[in-house]
């Protein structure tokens, strides 16, 4: 019966078209992810693609290793040498590209120095110009001090209480330093488009599974289905399991293809590098590596997708129509945009299911909650709550459809 339900899902023309659209979107996303890496040659000409990623990796290999005081001082020396030979000129695009070609091998380390010696809520691209060799060794210490200074300002009085401030400072202090650096462009690029892939899979899957329970009603065969010996129990169970199989299979097949293609082309190296190494996640209080962040992103994406689609299946089982059920994932994605201006909903929106689909972005946000006197971030909470809610929805869906009354 399960196989029959799965066949019914894919027997529809719209389902096949949606799968083709999803595969096409996968190809486009892989293309953008692979060409997201830019390498500038000695003539100042920009290149993208697999060869560009390979050449850029060679440039960055020179700076691979532990970013201790000596390594940071070497970056300062090299940057000043480049500045003397290839100075940045206002309005001179070609000259500036030549400058960028000489610093691209250590640009992420340069960004770390810029971030580390700016105010917490500020960024100065040229801050490295005024950082001394003796001063640069205090990079990691400065990271903690800038957070402490910001938390002590009037700006944060209404944002965090004393426990939350202490929690953030403790997490910053717990980061093991000095950080290790190597090229992690493959993981960074894969993360950049993973969110798009996850959302596309969820929206396409919504169209596929929303018709599982209403099918018999749209075909005017509901009286036959529910009057058969096993219709209400085995039939309902088969529909539910078929939906779970379809959602799970499509999600992990697409994610696996995306991961293998992008990381296979750009390289798997750098997975053990801490996410604070560089510009994007320098301020994050989650002390994890790029590989861990990627795994967290796709696992949380699956949890969020599964929850949204189970909710969609529940609506379809209750209303006997796919039209309303299809709108559920769209509503979950769009609703926070309309409610974000309501300050009193900030806590709720911080753990709304759409957040699971964009972990690589919210990992930079200080969404904190107090549970039994303990401060925790929003991500651990969602990773516990939504699997439980998803499991809870299963018997509710079954009972809702099982008890359907025939009119």
What do these predicted ranges mean?
Residues 1-16, 22:
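Aromatic- and glycine-rich beta-strand/loop motifs that create alpha-glucan
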Residues 11, 15-18, 304-312, 367-407:
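Alpha-helical transmembrane segments of multi-pass membrane transporters/translocases
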Residues 14, 231-232, 321-326:
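Membrane-helix interface segments
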Residues 22-26, 242-243, 330-334, 390:
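Residue-level recognition of pore/gate-forming positions within transmembrane alpha-helices
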Residues 24-81, 136-216, 237-318, 338, ...:
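Secretory targeting signals
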Residues 31-32, 319-352:
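Transmembrane helix segments
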Residues 209-224, 228, 232:
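Transmembrane helix boundary and interhelical loop/hinge segments in multi-pass membrane proteins
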Residues 347-368:
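Short hydrophobic, aromatic-rich alpha-helical segments embedded in or entering the lipid bilayer
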């Amino acid at each position: 019966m399960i196989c029959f339900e799965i066949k019914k899902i894919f027997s529809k023309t719209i389902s096949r078209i949606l799968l083709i659209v999803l595969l096409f979107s996968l190809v486009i996303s892989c293309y953008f992810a692979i060409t997201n890496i830019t390498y500038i040659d000695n003539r100042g000409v920009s290149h993208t693609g697999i060869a560009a990623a390979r050449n850029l990796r060679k440039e960055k290999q020179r700076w691979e290793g532990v970013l201790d005081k000596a390594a940071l001082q070497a970056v300062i020396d090299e940057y000043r040498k480049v500045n003397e030979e290839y100075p940045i000129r206002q309005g001179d695009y070609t000259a500036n590209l030549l400058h960028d070609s000489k610093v691209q091998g250590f640009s992420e380390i340069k960004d770390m120095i810029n971030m580390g010696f700016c105010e917490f809520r500020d960024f100065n691209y040229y801050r490295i110009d005024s950082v001394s060799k003796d001063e640069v060794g205090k990079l990691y210490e400065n990271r903690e001090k800038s957070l402490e200074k910001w938390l002590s300002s009037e700006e944060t009085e209404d944002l965090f209480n004393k426990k939350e401030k202490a929690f953030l400072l403790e997490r910053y202090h717990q980061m093991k330093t000095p950080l290790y650096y190597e090229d992690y462009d493959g993981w960074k690029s894969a993360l950049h488009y993973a969110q798009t892939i996850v959302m596309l899979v969820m929206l396409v899957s919504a169209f596929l599974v929303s018709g599982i329970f209403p099918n018999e009603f749209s075909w005017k065969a509901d009286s036959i289905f529910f009057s058969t010996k096993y219709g209400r129990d085995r039939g309902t169970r088969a529909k539910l399991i078929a939906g779970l199989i379809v959602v799970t299979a499509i999600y992990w097949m697409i994610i696996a293809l995306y991961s293998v293609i992008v990381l296979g082309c750009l390289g798997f190296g750098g997975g053990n590098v801490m996410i604070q190494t560089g510009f994007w996640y320098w301020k994050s209080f989650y002390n994890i590596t790029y590989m861990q962040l990627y795994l967290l992103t796709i696992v949380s994406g699956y949890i969020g997708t599964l929850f949204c689609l189970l909710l969609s299946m529940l609506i379809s089982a209750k209303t006997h129509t796919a039209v309303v059920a299809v709108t559920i994932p769209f509503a979950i994605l769009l609703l926070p945009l309309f409610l974000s201006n309501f300050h009193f909903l900030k806590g709720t929106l911080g753990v709304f299911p759409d957040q699971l689909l964009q972990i690589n972005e919210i990992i930079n946000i200080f969404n904190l909650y107090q549970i039994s006197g303990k401060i925790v971030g929003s991500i651990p909470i969602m990773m516990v709550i939504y699997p439980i809610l998803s499991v809870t929805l299963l018997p509710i869906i079954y009972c809702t459809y099982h008890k359907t009354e025939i009119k």
